[in-house]
Structures are given as structure tokens and as C-alpha cells.
Design a protein with these regions (language model features):
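Short alpha-helical transmembrane segments in multi-pass integral membrane proteins
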Residues: 1-26, 84-149, 182, 193-249, ...
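N-terminal transmembrane alpha-helices
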Residues: 13-50, 64-79, 83, 108-115, ...
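Transmembrane helical elements of multi-pass membrane transporters/channels
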Residues: 24-43, 145, 156, 179, ...
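Transmembrane alpha-helix boundary and packing residues in multipass membrane permease domains
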Residues: 29, 33, 45, 82, ...
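Helix-terminus/linker motif at the lipid-water interface of multi-pass membrane proteins
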Residues: 34, 38-57, 126-133, 189-196, ...
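Small-residue hotspots at the loop-to-helix junctions and early N-terminal turns
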Residues: 51-64, 139, 143, 202, ...
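Small-residue-rich hydrophobic transmembrane alpha-helices
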Residues: 56-116, 153-172, 279-343, 374-397, ...
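Short runs within selected transmembrane alpha-helices of multi-pass transporters and secretion channels
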Residues: 77, 145-164, 175-183, 201-216, ...
């Protein structure tokens, strides 16, 4: 299969200066993630302004739960992205095409499964999370409608992951912008005009997700290279499924472990009542915009590292890691400082209540300022996954981020002197320090192994060059 002659959206990750291309990849991806967050932010703002604090708490309290239920399958999309990027870097077009068709069919199966689980289990899980009784019905309704559109969500995420494997982060941005505009308009119409409350914002989100999924599928169908989607070739290739799962399941488990810990944290937040819940929900929405920058540099690091790993350029991989981490930390801390400085104004967008704004500022001061630590933790994982280390970061995350949070909340937080909301929030920076330090130590040893592979690879090439003249003489 021939490569597409139309390479406007592709980025050459194998040659040239790294930083400009890294930014060209990461900036549209950051904007794309921010647009996705605007879907949720629009939900939160419209509900907070026109439906009340109970509805705001109902929508916000679902954030961690939605992440918990979807992260395993979004991890599989990371596996598809890494595998596709390796084949792209190695110019193995037939294998890339098989990866595309396996990934799309896998996304459909994943979406259907999540829809069933989300609709049937919504109320039970929310009760387990200690969702207050006066919020429970609204939260359950929102969650069930949201998960009705999960097939479209999975389809978009897998499709966008495949496009990113070639360096194309621009078209997913355009598609999210189009669907985001529709989402905001429908939010206003359903809630203000039809008085549909949380059902309206959930329905608007589902419709917008369907639009973005349709656009990304259309894009893949119109491709002329190995990324082209042909519905007649849709099938699960067992080897490709195994390879996707080898990368994606550890990534998904890591995401689920994070989310499980966050659900536990959310349960602790819920115990302080509706005002703290609403303030925390609004602050989480702001923090997610900061995290979008971290996620962009993580995904850039994964894509660049995977392509160069496929091409065998190990020296370039080390440069990519250093530039990704430094740039990710600097830009993240800049966003963090801005979020705290303008915190009262930003939180005021979500709720007119002074008590809710004050509660949100407590969270921002204890968590947002330390997101640079999270950047180190997450971005360096991209280097490990890009060179094939998938289990290691999962185990580090299990112990450093998840176990430490659960231990803190079940021990220190339970002491009367420390049983206050600040002691819930501090668990984030503490776990980031522990996990980031461990990831850096792991990367040190992995990079030494990569150096040995480089020397062995160069020695093998030199030996082949020495043998070539002898073969010619014979």
C-alpha cells in the first residue's frame, strides 16, 4: 500500500529540530483536549447558572467515575496509537493498515460494553461513592444519558489516536471545534428553553460526541495511504489485537488505578457536603485545562519516541525525552500560576455562590500550583511506553500514586486533628512527588539499557559493512 501523497497534516518526527515539531504536535493537541473539556465546562457552567447547586454537584461528582469506567478502554486507544506510530516510523504500511482496522472495530466493541455497564450500574456505583441522597437521582440520570453515547466517544478517541500516530493533531482539533460549538448551543437550548436540567446537558454532550466521531471516521475513510479505513476490511487481526493489548492494557490499568484513587478522594470530598462538592467540581474543571497541557506533551513524547524506536534512532529518543519533560513542566507551571491568580474570576463563571467560589479556591491553592510535579510524572512515562516498557510505569503508579492516596485517606485523614478538606487535597502533591521520583529512577536505568542497545545496533551495522566487500569479491 502506497503512502498518501497528501502530507499536509503529517509531521516528520524522524528528522530535524525536535522542539518546533514537538510544539507543532502538542499545541493543537492541547487545544483539542481543552475543547473536549469545554464540553464538560459548558455542562457545569450552564447547570450551575440555570439549574442550581444540586445539579452542579450532580454533574461534577460524575467526573472521577466516568474516568474510572472509561480509562481501561482509552488505554487501548493509547496502545493503538503507539503500535501505529511504530509501524509508521518503520514504513510497514501493511501492518499499519491492519492496526487501523483492528482498532476501529475494537473501539465499537468497547463503546457498546461501556454503554451497558454505565446504564445498568450507574445508581449502585454512585451510592457506593457516598453521593448525597438529594443529588443521587440527578447524578444517576446524567450518568445514564452520558454513557448512552459512549460508542461515539470510543470511536472518536481511537480514530484520533490513529491520526496522531502520523503527527496529525490538527484535524481532530477542527472536528472538536465543530462539535463543541454544537454542544454549547444545545446546552443553552435544552436547559434554558426546554428546562431539561442535567438531562439536557448530558444529551447535548452525547449529540456533540456523535458529530466528532462521524467527522473522524469520514477523515479516515477519505485517507489514501495506510491510515485509510475501508469498512469491507474491518476485522480483528488477532496478532494486532494482542499487540494493542500488550501496550494498552497496562496503560488502561494505570488510568483505572488513578481513577479508582480519585473516586476514593471524591468520596472523601462528598462527605463534606454540597457546597464543598460544588466548589471542588468547579476547581476540577479548571484543573483539567491545566492537565490538558500535560497530556499533550505526554502524547507527543509517546508518538515521537515510538516512531524513532521503530526507525531505530535511539540517540534521538533521549533528546525527545529531555525536551518533552522540560517543556511540559515549564508550560504547565505557567498555566497553574495563571489558574490560581485568576481563580476567583474563573470559579465565578461556574457558580455565583461566594461559598462555592471560596471552596474552589481552597482546592486550587492546594493542588493546582503543584501540577509541574504531575508533568514530570506523566511525560516521562511516555518515554518508557514508547520504547516498550508498559508494565513498569503501571506498577510504579500502583504503588506511588494509588496506594499512597488510599493509605493516606484511610489513616492520616481519619485522625480528628487532620479530618478536614485540606488534608484530602494534599494527597495529590504528595503522591506526585513520590511517583515522579520513582519514574525518573526507572527512566535512568531504562536509558542505560537503551544506550547498550544503541552500541549493539551500531556494532552490528559495522560488522555488516565489513562483510559486504568480502561478499562482493566472492
Amino acid at each position: 500500500m502506497m503512502r498518501s501523497a497528501k502530507k499536509t497534516y503529517e509531521i516528520d518526527m524522524l528528522h530535524g529540530a525536535i522542539l518546533p515539531k514537538l510544539l507543532r504536535f502538542a499545541v493543537p493537541l492541547t487545544l483539542s483536549t481543552m475543547l473536549q473539556l469545554l464540553f464538560n465546562a459548558a455542562d457545569v457552567v450552564v447547570v450551575g447558572r440555570w439549574a442550581g447547586d444540586n445539579s452542579l454537584a450532580a454533574v461534577g461528582s460524575n467526573t472521577s467515575l466516568i474516568a474510572l469506567l472509561t480509562n481501561m478502554f482509552l488505554g487501548l486507544s493509547i496502545g493503538a496509537n503507539i503500535l501505529a506510530a511504530r509501524y509508521f516510523g518503520a514504513h510497514e504500511d501493511e501492518e499499519l493498515s491492519k492496526t487501523v482496522h483492528t482498532s476501529i472495530l475494537l473501539s465499537l466493541y468497547s463503546g457498546v460494553f461501556l454503554t451497558v455497564v454505565g446504564i445498568l450500574g450507574a445508581r449502585t456505583i454512585l451510592i457506593w461513592m457516598q453521593c448525597p441522597a438529594n443529588v443521587l437521582d440527578l447524578a444517576t440520570l446524567y450518568l445514564r444519558i452520558y454513557f448512552a453515547g459512549m460508542t461515539a466517544t470510543m470511536l472518536y478517541n481511537f480514530g484520533a489516536a490513529l491520526l496522531r500516530a502520523s503527527g496529525d493533531t490538527q484535524r481532530p482539533l477542527y472536528y472538536l471545534f465543530a462539535s463543541g460549538v454544537v454542544n454549547v448551543i444545545l446546552n443553552l437550548v435544552f436547559v434554558i428553553y426546554f428546562h431539561m436540567d442535567v438531562a439536557g446537558v448530558a444529551l447535548a454532550t452525547v449529540i456533540s460526541q456523535c458529530i466528532s466521531a462521524a467527522l473522524v471516521v469520514r477523515c479516515l475513510v477519505k485517507e489514501t495511504g495506510p491510515l485509510r479505513l475501508d469498512f469491507r476490511q474491518l476485522k480483528i487481526y488477532p496478532i494486532k489485537l494482542k499487540q494493542i493489548m500488550q501496550v494498552g492494557i497496562p496503560a488502561g490499568i494505570q488510568g483505572m488505578l488513578f481513577s479508582l484513587a480519585n473516586v476514593t478522594v471524591q468520596s472523601s470530598v462528598n462527605s463534606f457536603g454540597e457546597v464543598i462538592m460544588a466548589g471542588s467540581s468547579a476547581a476540577i474543571s479548571i484543573e483539567q485545562f491545566i492537565y490538558s497541557n500535560i497530556n499533550a506533551f505526554y502524547q507527543a513524547n509517546v508518538a515521537f519516541t515510538s516512531q524513532n524506536y521503530g526507525a531505530g534512532d535511539y540517540r534521538r529518543i533521549k533528546k525527545i525525552a529531555m525536551i518533552s519533560v522540560v517543556t511540559g513542566v515549564v508550560t504547565t507551571e505557567l498555566l497553574s500560576v495563571l489558574a490560581v491568580y485568576f481563580g476567583p474570576q474563573l470559579l465565578g463563571i461556574y457558580s455565583p455562590s461566594a461559598e462555592v467560589v471560596a471552596a474552589g479556591m481552597v482546592r486550587l491553592r492546594w493542588i493546582a500550583l503543584f501540577y509541574g510535579l504531575d508533568a514530570i510524572m506523566d511525560v516521562i512515562v511516555g518515554s518508557l511506553r514508547g520504547v516498550g516498557y508498559n508494565i513498569l510505569p503501571m506498577l510504579v503508579t500502583l504503588m506511588g500514586a494509588c496506594a499512597s492516596r488510599l493509605i493516606w485517606l484511610s489513616t492520616v485523614f481519619q485522625l480528628p486533628a487532620y479530618h478536614r478538606i485540606e488534608m484530602v487535597y494534599i494527597v495529590y502533591p504528595l503522591s506526585w512527588v513520590l511517583t515522579a521520583t520513582t519514574h525518573l529512577i526507572c527512566y535512568f536505568f531504562v536509558s542505560r539499557k537503551v544506550d547498550r542497545e544503541l552500541r549493539a545496533h551500531e556494532a552490528e551495522l559495522a560488522a555488516r559493512m565489513e562483510e559486504s566487500p568480502e561478499e562482493a569479491d566472492s
